[in-house]
């Protein structure tokens, strides 16, 4: 649903990672094993949230995070992150990097980087409300694309144009046959 080759985010961008999936007893943050890691990038638009990008990554290593940022954010942008070591390579990759270490200080993460945390909260609430908490990991990338599409067009005044854009995108990407969605393969099962 997200247009291939779409424009990258520009200006000032907040980037952080969140975890999507069911609850795990006694585990928090980066200790989580069964949840999927989703990187969130939110464009700053004054006090509001501009466009967003979301992507599931295999881990929170510098390589995974930089791959996402190169794909989602135009070079030269200012990227605001927490103190996680995975973001240390941003200046070498042609990005300005603003770090706010959030570890037991007076300021909470959602106060320092409100846009990215609002998007993560809305995503989780949307998944819970729409899918009743039944997020199947093999479909998560499709859910993230749908959420991104809807979020980035939330203030659109041209509803007809929205449908036109959706139809354009539907015919410009490879089809996802029922068998590949249900069984994870393009071969029909008998």
Go through each PLM region and give its residues.
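Residue-level recognition of single "structural anchor" positions
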Residues: 1-190
């Amino acid at each position: 649903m997200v247009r291939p080759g779409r424009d990258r985010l520009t200006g000032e961008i907040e980037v952080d990672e969140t975890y999507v999936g069911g609850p795990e007893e006694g585990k928090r943050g980066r200790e989580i094993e069964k949840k999927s890691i989703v990187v969130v990038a939110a464009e700053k638009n004054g006090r509001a949230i501009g466009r967003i990008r979301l992507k599931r990554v295999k881990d929170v290593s510098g390589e995974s995070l930089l791959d996402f940022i190169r794909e989602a954010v135009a070079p030269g942008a200012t990227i605001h992150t927490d103190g996680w070591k995975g973001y240390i390579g941003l200046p070498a990759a042609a990005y300005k990097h603003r770090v706010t270490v959030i570890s037991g200080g007076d300021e909470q993460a959602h106060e320092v980087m409100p846009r990215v945390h609002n998007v993560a909260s809305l995503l989780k609430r949307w998944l819970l409300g729409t899918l009743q908490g039944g997020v199947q990991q093999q479909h998560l990338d499709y859910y993230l694309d749908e959420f991104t599409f809807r979020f980035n067009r939330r203030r659109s005044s041209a509803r007809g144009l929205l449908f036109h854009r959706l139809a354009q995108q539907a015919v410009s990407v490879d089809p996802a046959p029922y068998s590949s969605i249900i069984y994870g393969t393009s071969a029909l099962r008998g």
